[in-house]
Design a protein with these regions (language model features):
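Negatively charged, low-complexity tracts enriched in Asp/Glu with abundant Ser/Thr
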Residues: 2-13
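Mixed-charge, Lys/Arg-enriched low-complexity segments
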Residues: 54-97
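Generic detector of short, aliphatic-rich beta-strand segments that form the cores of beta-sheets
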Residues: 1-2, 61
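Acidic, low-complexity, intrinsically disordered interaction modules
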Residues: 29-70
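Short, solvent-exposed loop/hinge segments that bridge or flank secondary-structure elements
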Residues: 21-31
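A short beta-strand micro-motif
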Residues: 12-21
């Protein structure tokens, strides 16, 4: 599947974390959600795209295993994210920390 997104040709970093209640979140550390400091784009099965505070999620959710994030990765690929690069942690490019 060829990507039609503006970032086509670039790898999109994604960090998968698992909350204590079992929900898995995909964080896109290089895709800002708004101009607010620390707010990045995220994706979950329920709610789908939304804002997330990157540092808060890292502090409250643990790294997800491949088995835990597999379904969410498949869902992301099915909606056009064909260029994902799974990383454990990343420093958002647009946040001065």
């Amino acid at each position: 599947m060829k990507s039609t997104r503006k970032s086509a040709g670039k790898m999109t970093k994604v960090v998968f974390r698992r909350y204590p209640d079992g929900q898995v979140i995909a964080l896109f550390p290089d895709i800002p959600w708004s101009g607010r400091r620390g707010e990045i784009t995220s994706y979950m099965h329920l709610g789908q795209h939304g804002a997330a505070d990157y540092h808060h999620v890292l502090a409250t959710a643990r790294l997800a295993t491949e088995d835990e994030y597999g379904d969410l990765l498949f869902e992301l690929q099915s909606i056009g994210y064909d260029d994902l690069h799974v990383v454990q942690r990343a420093r958002p490019k647009f946040i001065n920390t």
